[in-house]
Amino acid sequence: MSGYSSDRDRGRDRGFGAPRFGGSRAGPLSGKKFGNPGEKLVKKKWNLDELPKFEKNFYQEHPDLARRTAQEVETYRRSKEITVRGHNCPKPVLNFYEANFPANVMDVIARQNFTEPTAIQAQGWPVALSGLDMVGVAQTGSGKTLSYLLPAIVHINHQPFLERGDGPICLVLAPTRELAQQVQQVAAEYCRACRLKSTCIYGGAPKGPQIRDLERGVENCIATPGRLIDFLECGKTNLRRTTYLVLDEADRMLDMGFEPQIRKIVDQIRPDRQTLMWSATWPKEVRQLAEDFLKDYIHINIGALELSANHNILQIVDVCHDVEKDEKLIRLMEEIMSEKENKTIVFVETKRRCDELTRKMRRDGWPAMGIHGDKSQQERDWVLNEFKHGKAPILIATDVASRGLDVEDVKFVINYDYPNSSEDYIHRIGRTARSTKTGTAYTFFTPNNIKQVSDLISVLREANQAINPKLLQLVEDRGSGRSRGRGGMKDDRRDRYSAGKRGGFNTFRDRENYDRGYSSLLKRDFGAKTQNGVYSAANYTNGSFGSNFVSAGIQASFRTGNPTGTYQNGYDSTQQYGSNVPNMHNGMNQQAYAYPATAAAPMIGYPMPTGYSQ
């Protein structure tokens, strides 16, 4: 399996405890060849009297900061929307020099042309340098990575040198490979300047180089929980020297099911460590984790205390039906691609939808690429590199990329499928408007998402966004029980999908197998997939064009509003379809990107003006 050293690694870094082979979700088979991650790790019994002492309070208040009055501090915190809870919280630093970082660190900061600390850095640095446990709750793009990395360097510099067989002094746990790599990219420059070694360990990559880094000794280690547990179980590293622990995007790690692994890892670390937890939201599960792992911690919140989105993002919600999404997406992309800054992330719910939408858009000539959890690490790295450098300005992604994907110039986010929670919605749209920049988020919201409508409206109101009246109508329909085709937005899917006859799908996901709403001459138990309005008598396997479409010389015509093309053997054809992009193989290995040959159609309904008069 390309890119993965084992199937077990692949499952672990997605948060699943049971192995893919040899067991089940209920637990391993009786032979116990494979087990749950971390089951070989024994919880350590710590005697603090026997442990070597270490220092963790290095903070010296700058004279300029000492002269600052309590009223001036409070005025600054209000201006930056900083809320602090806890005892003896230090004053925020207003300038980099007030943090008293080493000269090597200040040189790197100067080269990066930073003007002043962000809000979370200003308040977080004094807390972390004081050796206090802390929780930082801040929106994405707020500079939290440096908030814990620079104090980590100071912490490491004050500890004894590593000896042979020692593990890392600083451990950063991250939920995804992408986030771990991005943290490592930031850490590498600062650690190199301070003559410290930093490494990144994650699943989906060869273990050998990662093991060699650990065996040579590294002061700083960024890791995903699954791969770290692998190395702890087989004795390739240990956490005996770890005194500075960071849980980055703790809410995301809990969402991905990593809590058991996190607890196993923390059990291997001495209890008098310094712990910093970072999160974009503050649900009860994260609060419980903080109570279990942190002691007398300082809680720092940036922005509104309730669920909130970045106010620099223009949020536009289009209430529609599922069968309308494809057409609306194409119209929207035609408008976006005419802009000079057009880097766009399209979020979908499932891996299957990601692959299908990527293939469809590339067949139509759009420079799109897809990324999700089942892609090999090599392919994911390549796709992200193409996206970051603008060679493929459209990235179609599942939630694997919704947090931690740090690309500065993403201008647009499109929620093709609305996520399961408003927390995920906020994280998704947070991929744009990084730092102080602006961005736009478009969302397709269907009656099937009605359970999230109230939360979405709350997020929009908090951010002072115009609210589509159709959203308010959905709230009324939900209260009156009319939301599912009995009033309000009429649910016309039955007529669209089955030409007046009930199509026989049992769930919404079955309905998704009909992408455009035209019937097929074939009858399948789960519904043959008829993409883009195909009406064909060709043989289907699993109803998917392009991978399991068996034509045996039969030609099927695509009628979608674009020039009719002829496809044989799925979509692998030299026939040009809508643009000059031949020979599309699984959405990859194209000769060149080409924008649609036809002139961009005028936008309908985007952007929605205030009041939504259309």
UniProtKB/Swiss-Prot annotation:
This is Probable ATP-dependent RNA helicase DDX5. Residues 328-475 form the Helicase C-terminal domain. The modification Phosphoserine is found at S24, S480, S520. There is a cross-link at K53 (Glycyl lysine isopeptide (Lys-Gly) (interchain with G-Cter in SUMO1)). Sumoylated; sumoylation, promoted by PIAS1, promotes interaction with HDAC1 and transcriptional repression activity. Sumoylation also significantly increases stability, and reduces polyubiquitination. Residues 125-300 form the Helicase ATP-binding domain. The gene is DDX5. InterPro entries: DEAD/DEAH_box_helicase_dom (IPR011545), Helicase_ATP-bd (IPR014001), Helicase_C-like (IPR001650), P-loop_NTPase (IPR027417), P68_rpt (IPR012587), RNA-helicase_DEAD-box_CS (IPR000629), RNA_helicase_DEAD_Q_motif (IPR014014). One of its GO terms (molecular function) is ATP binding. Keywords: Acetylation, ATP-binding, Biological rhythms, Cytoplasm, Helicase, Hydrolase, Isopeptide bond, Methylation, mRNA processing, mRNA splicing, Nucleotide-binding, Nucleus, Phosphoprotein, RNA-binding, Spliceosome, Transcription, Transcription regulation, Ubl conjugation. The lineage of its organism: Eukaryota, Metazoa, Chordata, Craniata, Vertebrata.
